[in-house]
Amino acid sequence: MTIIITKIADKIIKSNRVKNTLQDIHIHSSNCGCHGSFKSNSVMNQTFSSFSSLTTEKNEQQQQQLFKQFSNSKPIPMGRKVELDTSKVIDSVYFGNTENNNYRTNKGNTDYAFEASANNIRFGSGVTYEVGYDLLDMNCRNVIVFTDNNLLKLVDTDKESAVAKCLYSLEKCGIKYTIYSDVSIEPTDTSFKDAISVMGKGRYDGVVAVGGGSVMDTAKAANLYNSYPPADNDFLAYINPPIGKGLLVPGPLKRPLIAIPTTCGTASETTGVCILDIKLGDGLSAKTGIASRHLKPILGLVDPDNLLTLPSNVAISSGFDQLCHALESFTAIPFNQRSPRPLAPNQRPSYQGANPVSDVWSLRSLEMLCKNIHRFVLNPNDDYARSQMMLAASYAGLGFGNSGVHACHGMSYSISSMVKDYKPEGYYGLKKNLIPHGQSVILSAPAVFKFTAPSNPERHLLLAKIMGADISNASESDAGVLLSNQIVKLMKLLNVPNGLQALGYKESDIDSLVKGTLPQHRVTKLMPKQATYDDLYKLFKDSMTIY
């Protein structure tokens, strides 16, 4: 089955029945998912100038003074023009009209309920050493360990590295293992198929993933296709539409998967999603994925010590992925405004729109990230900041894993899949052009949240306030600019490339970028304000240069 993405996009652009198209797709695959200015006395403003002056040989006294500023920072007082009560901001969306949340009285086509789903998470320094005991408890004696070559190389030089600790635990518990390390950074259909094939040749009773999102997503896919091989080995069977067929995963996977993250962004240890880049022919490709609650790891071992070997640029990219998870989750369309209404409970999508449970996790994740990302990037040995960043990533995963993400991620898939001549620093052993996921996500964020702010100004103002904005004299019309400015400040602080032009894109590429975004229904349908072709074109244009 060959699908050319430009044809899909053109059809969507010309169609006058986009809403019906989305509804048909949703019913066909209900489990599709993903994917204000600082004041002069602002702590982050002071940090900005301090951070830019630091060199690789950082002065310890400078660091301590900088960290002290963060630890002593206090929330900015609530605004006078817009009085924000967090619980009211959350509850008013869902419970302002109780008829919208009632099966008997809701006669429309929107949903009336949400479902909170989470897997088991164990957090703490050293929990990686427990993986062998957990596998024994699950009656696993022969497992396949997924990782990447960079992490595997550390085994010989660092006995406290994540893979070294995992293998030590397996050997101590007498568990046989086979290592698969050919995971591709930003996986493709080709790399997924290779992992599926290798796993299928062994008689494994358990799966372990040690790495970032690419590793964990590869392990999920290999486990799925070996648990329920599709008819005629049709790889597109479980892939989200309109790229794939979007068939429902039949049931729980046949081998338990334990995920051990080594980055602080994707939160793949908490979600039932795996993302890949699919080649479509004619030199075109598209980011898409597989989504099902059955894909969630049975256990996530979240060990902050596994971030000690994380390169700073990878940490920054991971942090921005985490940031957008929190922002997009909290601003996604509310669950009771999402349509179509499911025909049965098992057709309710795992990415179901913002809801009271996802809001709690997303807001807390954002608070933790804003207080600690600078400290962590400047000093990975800061135990507190490192632990907070690791835990915040899982919090964000618990949030967006139940609500979803929207425009930033939807746009990022065409940005990363259409990469030109760009290789980021800090991604060792990279053999292909690559735009890191977190980088591709954050570059559109300033424009996106200006666009979505009118859908719910209070929610956007609350996010801006958490990020450090002074909203004391803010009005609802200021919400988008205030939040956008805070995001830009953080991007400058951490030296993110200045827009899509810095990655090699030109204005002549925007049409292709838009057409690559339009089919990403699994995330764009969760936008609180739906975007047309022209809207997306402007969002990409505004993201070309940011500073």
Curated annotation (Swiss-Prot):
Catalyzes the cofactor-independent reversible oxidation of gamma-hydroxybutyrate (GHB) to succinic semialdehyde (SSA) coupled to reduction of 2-ketoglutarate (2-KG) to D-2-hydroxyglutarate (D-2-HG). L-3-hydroxybutyrate (L-3-OHB) is also a substrate for HOT when using 2-KG as hydrogen acceptor, resulting in the formation of D-2-HG. It catalyses: (S)-3-hydroxybutanoate + 2-oxoglutarate = (R)-2-hydroxyglutarate + acetoacetate; 4-hydroxybutanoate + 2-oxoglutarate = (R)-2-hydroxyglutarate + succinate semialdehyde. Keywords: Mitochondrion, Oxidoreductase, Transit peptide. It comes from Dictyostelium discoideum (Social amoeba). It comes from the Eukaryota. The gene is adhfe1. This is Probable hydroxyacid-oxoacid transhydrogenase, mitochondrial. One of its GO terms (cellular component) is mitochondrion. GO terms for molecular function: alcohol dehydrogenase (NAD+) activity; hydroxyacid-oxoacid transhydrogenase activity; metal ion binding.
